[in-house]
């Protein structure tokens, strides 16, 4: 509701490691859009009439475009934990978590693949947290948009420890897998690391 009031017409739900809130989020958005969808249906019916003048058609098309702009779009996603090794590795301290990676479904195929990845993270990769890995990311990447995520992301972590070669390799790997659907995040949130963003950008 707050997003809509501030002029935004879309929002993504990206809970960490799960999609438990997706159904409630989608259903609520569908309910909020119901009146607007009824208006769109009525406007399309009016446009289908054969006795309209060109001015009337233009006015109806304008109203239709404005109504379609009011539709709120729910973006279904997840902030996944990507294992530093294999999702099957469950022995070392570093296996207890994973790099953060934001995944968004851009179509039905992407939604199905996202559900598959999250499920595999719980069924096969769970070790303190549900983890996926590069192998299944590559296998189920179709229809997904990927973002490098927060300070816990793979690229940031490698930049932070000064391993720019490994960071570049990570960028190239994600670019190879997701193509134009891979994005690197830049954030302006306060951290306890002075000039962290500037140092990263300079390099």
Please report, for each region that a protein language model flagged, where it lies by residue.
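Phosphodiester-processing cores and adjacent nucleic acid-binding clamps
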Residues: 1-203
């Amino acid at each position: 509701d707050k997003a809509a009031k501030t002029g935004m017409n879309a929002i993504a739900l990206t809970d960490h490691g799960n999609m438990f809130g997706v159904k409630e989020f989608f259903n609520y958005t569908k309910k909020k859009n119901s009146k607007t969808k009824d208006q769109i249906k009525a406007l399309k019916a009016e446009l289908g009439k054969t006795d309209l003048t060109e001015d009337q058609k233009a006015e109806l098309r304008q109203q239709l475009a404005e109504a379609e702009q009011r539709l709120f779009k729910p973006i279904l996603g997840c902030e996944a934990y990507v294992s530093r090794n294999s999702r099957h590795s469950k022995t070392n301290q570093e296996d207890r978590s994973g790099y953060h990676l934001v995944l968004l479904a851009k179509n039905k195929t992407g939604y199905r693949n996202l559900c598959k990845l999250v499920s595999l993270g719980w069924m096969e990769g769970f070790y303190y947290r549900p983890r996926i890995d590069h192998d299944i990311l590559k296998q189920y990447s179709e229809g997904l948009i990927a973002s490098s995520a927060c300070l816990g992301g793979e690229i940031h972590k490698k930049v932070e420890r000064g391993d720019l070669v490994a960071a570049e390799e990570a960028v190239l790997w994600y670019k190879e897998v997701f193509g134009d659907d891979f994005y690197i995040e830049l954030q302006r949130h306060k951290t306890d690391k002075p000039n962290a963003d500037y140092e990263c950008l300079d390099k």
